[in-house]
């Protein structure tokens, strides 16, 4: 063994350049692996940050989401929701939503916004937070309450001095006027799959009773049990 050690030292002396280059190659290789791993982790965190607090566990289903053959025969209604519950695993929540163009009016001020008719706890599913006020209750949706939650930019446009809570505003859609009470204002969101800043939200129960009876949903939003399963669940739905 001692002779082997002596031979190794002699080889090192005779091949210093080769040994140095070999060590340099190993060092560069290890450093590259560390750098790539670090960049990969950083990219993953950046993606998560860009989606905001809403996470990556949300699947939004619209006609364009479905394959062409399925889309021609599917209606986004209660029957389709039941079909999803019964046939697709790893779904935690299913929400039917309807979109509407809306003009909001308070006194002499008005602003255009994206109206969304939602079901109970839809906003909580996205982890949206309130600047003040309350979210819709189950009763609000069932009874079709004339309540409205404003995105931060809409609230600022209509109530530049703040204090929108409890105020009565007018929502105009398809040239029809509806009165709503402001029950909440959302905090400004830094990012995410859905940015509510320029949106307003009303109970879908009101939409289905007063605006469009027995409506087919504009889209369906599903929350999966684990964000790692999102791709698999989406493929199963298609």
Task: Enumerate the predicted regions with their spans.
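Signature of the 12-TM Major Facilitator Superfamily
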Residues: 19-23, 35, 166
């Amino acid at each position: 063994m001692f002779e082997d050690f002596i031979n190794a030292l002699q080889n090192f002396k005779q091949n210093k350049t080769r040994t140095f280059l070999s060590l340099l190659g190993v060092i560069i290789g290890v450093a590259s692996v560390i750098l790539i791993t670090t960049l990969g982790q950083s990219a993953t965190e950046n993606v998560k940050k860009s989606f905001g607090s809403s996470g990556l566990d949300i699947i939004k289903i619209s006609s364009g989401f479905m394959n062409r053959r399925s889309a021609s025969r599917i209606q986004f209604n209660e029957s389709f929701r039941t079909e999803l519950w019964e046939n697709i695993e790893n779904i935690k929540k299913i929400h039917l939503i309807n979109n509407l163009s809306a003009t909001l009016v308070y006194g002499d001020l008005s602003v255009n916004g994206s109206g969304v008719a939602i079901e109970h706890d839809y906003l909580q599913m996205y982890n949206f937070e309130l600047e003040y006020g309350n979210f819709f209750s189950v009763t609000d949706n069932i009874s079709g309450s004339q309540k409205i939650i404003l995105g931060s930019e809409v609230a600022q446009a209509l109530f530049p001095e703040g204090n929108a809570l409890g105020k009565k505003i007018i929502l105009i859609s398809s040239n029809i006027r509806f009165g709503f009470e402001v029950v909440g204002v959302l905090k400004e969101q830094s990012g995410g799959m859905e940015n509510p800043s320029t949106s307003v939200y009303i109970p879908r129960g009101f939409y289905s009773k007063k605006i469009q009876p027995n409506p087919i949903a504009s889209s369906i939003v599903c929350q999966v049990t684990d964000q790692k399963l999102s791709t698999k669940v989406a493929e199963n739905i298609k």
